[in-house]
Amino acid sequence: MPSPTRRSSKSRSKSRSRSRSASASPGKAAKRARSKTPRRGKKRARSPSKKARRRSRSTKKTAAKRRKRSSSPKKRRSAGKRRVRAKKKKKK
């Protein structure tokens, strides 16, 4: 009896591996086919809006705000860590 059960488990594992590879390969092939298809006109139409968004993000005012935001939480974190370290040293 043990031999037929083993065979069935093997066949199941094989079918699983096949299904995974099969599901992965056609998706990749489709992506490759899409990249080769000429859709240049649509891309050109999209690009100016993206550029405008990037410009608005990288203005001096927004950059300054970002710097302030990024610097303040870092300072708080480092201060908290220092306090913890100091407490540990005192205990020793």
Swiss-Prot record:
Entry's Gene Ontology cellular component terms: nucleosome; nucleus
UniProt region (Disordered), positions on chain: 1-92
Gene Ontology biological process terms in this record: cell differentiation; spermatogenesis
GO MF annotations, alphabetized: DNA binding
Subcellular location as annotated: Nucleus; Chromosome
Domain of life: Eukaryota
Annotated tissue distribution: Sperm.
Primary localization class, coarse: nucleus
Annotated Basic residues bias: 7-19, 29-92
Keywords annotated in UniProt: Chromosome, Developmental protein, Differentiation, DNA-binding, Nucleosome core, Nucleus, Spermatogenesis
Role description: Involved in nuclear basic protein transition: histones are replaced by spermatid specific proteins which are themselves replaced by protamines in late spermatids.
Name of the protein: Sperm-specific protein Phi-1
